[in-house]
Design a protein with these regions (language model features):
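C-terminal and inter-domain tail/linker signature
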Residues: 1-130
Length: 130
C-alpha cells in the first residue's frame, strides 16, 4: 500500500478489524480523525467501539463488496458476518475522507444490523464525544 492509495488504506483498516489487530490501525488514522457515527475525535474511541463490538459479537467481521474512490473520498459497502441472523444480509456503508494518506473523517450507516450492535458501539461516557 502506498501512502496515497485511499482504497488500500480502507482495505487495510478492515483487515486490522477482521484480524483483531486494532493497535496496528493507529497509523491509518489522523490524530484528529472524526467519526460522525460516534461523534468523537481521535481513533481511540473507534478502537474502544471495535473492542466492545467484538466482545459482544466475537465472530463479527466485514467483507468489502464495493469500494469507490473519488479524489479524497472512499465509499465502501461491506457485508457483515458473524452476527445473529436477520431477515436480510446485513450491510455497512461507510464513507471516509483521506488526508495526507490517512483516514481523517468517517460517516457510516448500517442496514439489517441488530439494534444491539448500535447500542454496543455507542459510548455516552467517551470524553472525546461531541
Amino acid at each position: 500500500m502506498t501512502a496515497r492509495d485511499p482504497e488500500a488504506l480502507v482495505r487495510r483498516m478492515q483487515e486490522c478489524f477482521n484480524t483483531r489487530q486494532f493497535d496496528q490501525a493507529d497509523d491509518l488514522f489522523t490524530p484528529d480523525f472524526f467519526s460522525h457515527p460516534l461523534g468523537t475525535t481521535g481513533f481511540a474511541a473507534g478502537k474502544r467501539a471495535w473492542r466492545t463490538l467484538v466482545t459482544h459479537f466475537p465472530d463479527y467481521r466485514v467483507v468489502a463488496e464495493d469500494v469507490l474512490v473519488d479524489h479524497d473520498r472512499v465509499a465502501i459497502r461491506s457485508s457483515v458476518h458473524g452476527i445473529p441472523p436477520t431477515d436480510a444480509q446485513p450491510v455497512l456503508i461507510e464513507i471516509f475522507r483521506v488526508a495526507d494518506g490517512r483516514l481523517a473523517e468517517a460517516w457510516g450507516v448500517g442496514q439489517g444490523l441488530p439494534h444491539d450492535i448500535l447500542r454496543t458501539t455507542a459510548s455516552s461516557d467517551d470524553p472525546h464525544r461531541h
